[in-house]
Amino acid sequence: MKYNLSLLEFLILKQLYVDGFNYLVRDIDNNLCAYKDYPKFWNDTWIPISDWYDLEAFNNIFDFVGYEEPIAVKDVLSDYNCDEAD
């Protein structure tokens, strides 16, 4: 399943993983993956900036504290749904 920005808006409105960082989201292998806004990502030439969504425009930003690798949004949503069932 290919997610779109509206799913991210839903997750953000649910106030999941909120903190003060900016995050970048990119479609990788049909999954939206979120990265912290580390300077090294801007410097990597294999990342076309036009392929990224800057979440800074939203009021609340995903908090993937401690992760430098991409996090698949579908995994975050699955974890959230499991938490809701408990």
Please state what every model-predicted region is.
Residues 10-12, 46, 52:
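Tryptophan-centered short beta-strand motifs
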Residues 25-26, 36:
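Hydrophobic side chains in beta-strands
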Residues 31-45:
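Short, surface-exposed terminal/edge motifs of secreted or surface/virion proteins that either
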Residues 11-13, 36, 70:
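Alpha-helical interaction segments
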Residues 19-23, 29-31:
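Short, surface-exposed beta-edge/turn micro-motifs
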Residues 49-86:
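Low-complexity intrinsically disordered segments
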Residues 6-18:
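Surface-exposed ligand/attachment interfaces on beta-rich extracellular proteins
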